[in-house]
């Protein structure tokens, strides 16, 4: 990896990878904010992907097969992996439950419960990208001490009409 930034090229590579695996996913985090605004607003250390938890083993195996190494293992809540060429990837398995609810394992035990309408899609660079909604992004940027980057992302989210 030339630097610590994950570019649009790596982003599209990862999105293509999830689509080729036929795994339902949503872009989250900083790249999710930028996709919602319609342009890259800042540099990114990683890509955050929420995905259908029933495919967790398949996703991890594929990522390891192409050279990703596990850096942080907080499963079933999240896992952070690093690739020398593609950079950091933060994966978050989510449960698409039969009753229509969506949950994610909480690292302290129990589950986070998400609203279905938080999982949306937007157009970015002539591509339809599943992503976490503006409302959910704003909610996820609360309840902790915000960084300068968080404040920047919130400002950009609030600029979306």
Curated annotation (Swiss-Prot):
<dbReference type="GO" id="GO:0046677">
    <property type="term" value="P:response to antibiotic"/>
</dbReference>
<dbReference type="InterPro" id="IPR043519">
    <property type="entry name" value="NT_sf"/>
</dbReference>
<keyword id="KW-0046">Antibiotic resistance</keyword>
<dbReference type="InterPro" id="IPR019646">
    <property type="entry name" value="Aminoglyc_AdlTrfase"/>
</dbReference>
<protein>
    <recommendedName>
        <fullName>Lincosamide resistance protein</fullName>
    </recommendedName>
</protein>
<dbReference type="Pfam" id="PF10706">
    <property type="entry name" value="Aminoglyc_resit"/>
</dbReference>
